[in-house]
């Protein structure tokens, strides 16, 4: 006798997805970032009290979210400590997918006199950081561990061997990489592939409709290697506002508003008004439409912001609307993609294939298989029938 279907999720956040072709773990379509949590960086990032942080974590969890991101470095280690305290108090560790990172100088305020090995991607830094993260998160395993950045001093061999040993020991389940060149990631995964080691399954980096340099090399590399994408900065780091709003509210003491962000904010607001949602929902929906296996990292400071972000999962954008957003500010994809795909009649788009290369099609009509499409947004709630 077949089992009945699972109950309807409390929100669109509860329709979970496979993380990537290389990692079968199931995660919510949005990842809650906790860089605001910890109480140490209030001058740069604004004040989020522990009470507010726990309320955000509670609402994310109640809405069906299970994918949460932190790092050893955030808030002078305060982010991991608060997250670990919340998880322990709620008793829901195994329901969650916790992601953290190593490489950054996480002991900046520690009592140690010599701190040279409390940073970097090498084996000692990895060991020290992971043991500390496990203690702060109050757990005995990490679902996803990122190399936080490429330090350009540790070899591919050392990084991949050391990470694999942690996976084999059961302390880490999956590995990812952040803020690294595409060629480095490809080289790491090639080494792992040919030596029977664990491969990177997700890439985290800056990507937004006003930060499209990610699309030059990183996006196609991830699509080719089977990596998921966890973009940070999807909301323009708080700059998608009018000049008046920015002047009144500011943005975490991170400098003046850039003109490209003001223009993009106006366009996102315009598209959002047509669809009855906030500009932030359009910014997230844009990324969710660009490629499969995209899990934006959302950094919220209020429950209201979180609720607005969740609505992005029900927003449908046409190709024309995506192009409208992209054409708001210039984007130079650079050589060789511009040379191959652009012409006076054609702008580069990230979904282009062989049939869009004019040197290929100038003497023959060529058809090609489209690039894989992402999961379509859900319009309200849908029954998930089992066959």
From Swiss-Prot:
A GO biological-process term: sterigmatocystin biosynthetic process
InterPro entries: AKR_Detox_Biosynth, NADP_OxRdtase_dom, NADP_OxRdtase_dom_sf
UniProt record similarity statement: Belongs to the aldo/keto reductase family. Aldo/keto reductase 2 subfamily.
SUPFAM superfamilies according to UniProt: NAD(P)-linked oxidoreductase
UniProt keyword terms in alphabetical order: NADP, Oxidoreductase
EC number: 1.1.1.-
Positions of NADP(+) binding: 69, 178-179, 204, 233-243, 301-309
Residues annotated as binding substrate: 148
Protein name per its UniProtKB record: Norsolorinic acid reductase stcV
Organism encoding this protein: Emericella nidulans (strain FGSC A4 / ATCC 38163 / CBS 112.46 / NRRL 194 / M139) (Aspergillus nidulans)
């Amino acid at each position: 006798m077949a089992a009945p279907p699972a109950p309807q999720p409390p929100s669109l956040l509860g329709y979970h997805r496979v993380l990537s072709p290389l990692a079968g773990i199931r995660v919510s379509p949005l990842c809650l970032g906790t860089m605001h949590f910890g109480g140490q960086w209030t001058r740069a990032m604004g004040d989020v009290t522990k009470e507010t942080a726990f309320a955000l974590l509670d609402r994310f969890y109640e809405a069906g979210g299970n994918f949460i991101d932190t790092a050893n470095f955030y808030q002078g280690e305060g982010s991991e400590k608060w997250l670990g305290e919340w998880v322990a108090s709620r008793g829901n560790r195994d329901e969650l997918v916790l992601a953290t990172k190593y490489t950054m100088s996480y002991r900046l305020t520690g009592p140690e006199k010599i701190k040279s090995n409390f940073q970097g991607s090498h084996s000692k830094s990895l060991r020290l950081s992971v043991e500390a993260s496990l203690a702060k998160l109050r757990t005995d395993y990490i679902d996803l561990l990122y190399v936080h950045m490429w330090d350009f001093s540790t070899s591919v061999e050392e990084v991949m061997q050391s990470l694999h040993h942690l996976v084999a020991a059961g302390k880490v389940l999956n590995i990812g990489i952040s803020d690294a060149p595409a060629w480095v990631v490809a080289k790491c995964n090639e080494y792992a592939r040919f030596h029977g080691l664990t491969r990177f399954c997700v890439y985290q980096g800056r990507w937004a409709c006003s930060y499209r340099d990610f699309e030059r090399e990183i996006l196609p590399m991830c699509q080719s290697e089977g990596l998921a994408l966890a973009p940070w900065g999807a909301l323009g780091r708080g700059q998608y506002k009018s000049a008046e709003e920015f002047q009144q509210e500011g943005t975490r003491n991170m400098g003046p508003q850039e003109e490209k962000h003001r223009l993009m904010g106006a366009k996102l607001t315009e598209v959002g008004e047509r669809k009855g949602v906030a500009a932030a929902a359009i910014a997230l929906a844009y990324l969710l439409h660009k490629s499969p296996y995209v899990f934006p990292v959302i950094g919220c400071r209020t429950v209201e912001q979180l609720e607005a972000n969740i609505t992005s999962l029900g927003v449908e954008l046409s190709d024309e609307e995506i192009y409208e957003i992209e054409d708001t500010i210039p984007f130079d994809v650079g050589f060789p993609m511009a040379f191959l795909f652009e012409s006076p009649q054609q702008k580069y788009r990230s979904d282009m294939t062989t049939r869009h290369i004019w040197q290929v099609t100038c003497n023959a009509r060529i058809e090609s298989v489209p690039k894989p499409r992402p999961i379509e947004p859900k319009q309200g709630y849908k029954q998930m029938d089992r066959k």
